[in-house]
């Protein structure tokens, strides 16, 4: 049972900072931001230290590729935030605004058709950071997928980018065999050899 009594304004303020009240307790979870899910070994250690020092020792990963430190008492929230900021990280990712940008590993994945890390980092700077104080009617989610395999589900976001392969036709190499390799590998049957 929770014995903590917070005003609605204080709850809203904390949520806007990235602190979410843990159901039935006086504790909070804090969302530590990542840029497209990438964190360094030093950041991992700092997050683990923060979880053990301020929370209940548990880290969870969100669908927006942020890391939640759970079980932080209300009276330790400010100290926790200072610790995280001193480690070069930030908390946030909640509220009616642009949410943290998610990305697949298309930059390094064998199926990646674009540099998903670079694109999502640019979008993060321009929209997550650039529009950080802009109040929206609802949360706005952005995802960058490196290929049509859809691992990060860009089509389920408010704005999704999906890498595509564009076949290049070189007429001078075509022998007119009517066994086009593009047609043979198109899983949707969208590419067809035609006399037109």
Where are these regions (language model features)?
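Iron-sulfur cluster-binding cysteine motifs and their immediate structural context
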Residues: 179-196
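Short, flexible, solvent-exposed loop/turn segments with mixed acidic/basic and small polar residues
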Residues: 19-24, 55-61, 189-194
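Intrinsically disordered, low-complexity polar/charged tails and linkers
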Residues: 1-25
